[in-house]
Regions:
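N-terminal nucleophile
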Residues: 1-160
Length: 160
């Protein structure tokens, strides 16, 4: 996939994000992907954190994936945990094998902690801040990571 998601934290503590996509090849005329839909391809809450997505947009926007990542951070999960739990939740709700979803998330919280998770083998992502720059590999999720841990989802627990 050719989507680029960027999340950043300025020296003054302001969070920002952006995303760009080339779109799905051979798409249906008029298709709108997840990138321009706030909460799907990108979401920033300056009190909590920011998240961006890449992958099959339809599988991300049906669940407002980036918004969900930030909400999990609001509940206390680290950025990587929030990305992974979002993928697990989408997989549980969708019902298809997790590898068929082709979704990936990056996240950054207000404290400057970052993380990422993706389906299948995951994906590489870049991190840079003063004195550090590297390309890292995201957490990789497959069928064995879905589970049905009932009661471990702080968002779903609030809806009960």
């Amino acid at each position: 996939h050719d989507t680029i998601a960027l999340v950043g934290l300025a020296k003054d503590g302001t969070l920002a994000g952006g995303c760009s996509t080339s779109g799905l090849a051979y798409k249906m005329p008029g298709r709108v992907g997840d990138s321009p839909i706030l909460g799907s391809g990108l979401y920033v809450d300056n009190e909590i954190g920011a998240a961006g997505a890449t992958g099959v947009g339809e599988n991300i926007m049906r669940f407002c994936g980036s918004f969900m990542v930030v909400e999990y951070m609001r509940q206390g999960l680290t950025p990587e945990e929030a990305c992974a739990e979002t993928i697990r939740r989408i997989a549980r709700l969708d019902g298809r094998p997790i590898e068929d979803l082709h979704i990936n998330f990056i996240a950054l919280d207000k404290k400057g902690r970052f993380g990422a998770a993706g389906t299948g083998q995951g994906f590489p992502y870049a991190v840079t801040y003063p004195g550090y720059s590297d390309v890292l590999q995201s957490k990789a999720l497959s069928r064995k990571h879905i589970g049905s841990e009932g009661g471990n989802d702080p968002i779903e627990d609030q809806l009960k």
